[in-house]
Amino acid sequence: MRRLVRALAIVAVMGAGVLAIAPARHAALRSTGRILVASDQPQPADLIVTDVESGPAGLLTIGDLHRSQPNAAVGVLVPRATRIDAEMQQRGIVLPNLTVEMLAQLGIREDAIVRIPAGEGGTSETTRALGEWGRSNPGKRVLVVVGPSHGRRYRRALRRAWPDGHLAPIVITAPYALFRAEDWWQSRTTVREGLVELEKLALDYARHPW
């Protein structure tokens, strides 16, 4: 009986230890997620735009923002054509423009859309393209929607690319994205996304400590 009681006590202590570790681990993972998910407060803007990588989640957020500020232009960052695009064009293959079609279904008119050439469409290219747009449109406020895991790194890159003396850009994260700071480690998809972004953010701080 004593052995049984002792064994149960050991199991209880071990179980309590595991339960104590799990909340601490989850708290650390949530804190790690919040490092990535940096977001400004939404403000009225002259141009609202989503980065290339945020996909439908970013476009849904654009739709919400445009309903509250219908006079704002909607920016679409357009990566340059690739060899694959050229080959499809040569063969007469025309793919639907899903971005423009989704914006139309969200109630955004074609004449409200501003197309902005964005090089290869990565973070460096899109932030540089937006910086050039800001330089060409002084006094205009720009609001950019990005994926949550991309928030801090994109905001840092955009501020570096932004012209001095112009209204600072606003960067907010898409609430419809799969990545959430509260539970990103519970899905392989978001775990992969989070780890990749943590690595990229660390590299960004190494290259640009300020």
Regions found by a protein language model. Give the residues of each.
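A structural signal for short, hydrophobic/glycine-enriched beta-strand patches
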Residues: 24-185
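A transmembrane-helix-recognition feature enriched in membrane-embedded lipid enzymes
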Residues: 186-210
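A short, flexible N-terminal coil/short beta segment enriched in small residues
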Residues: 1-17, 71-72, 81-90
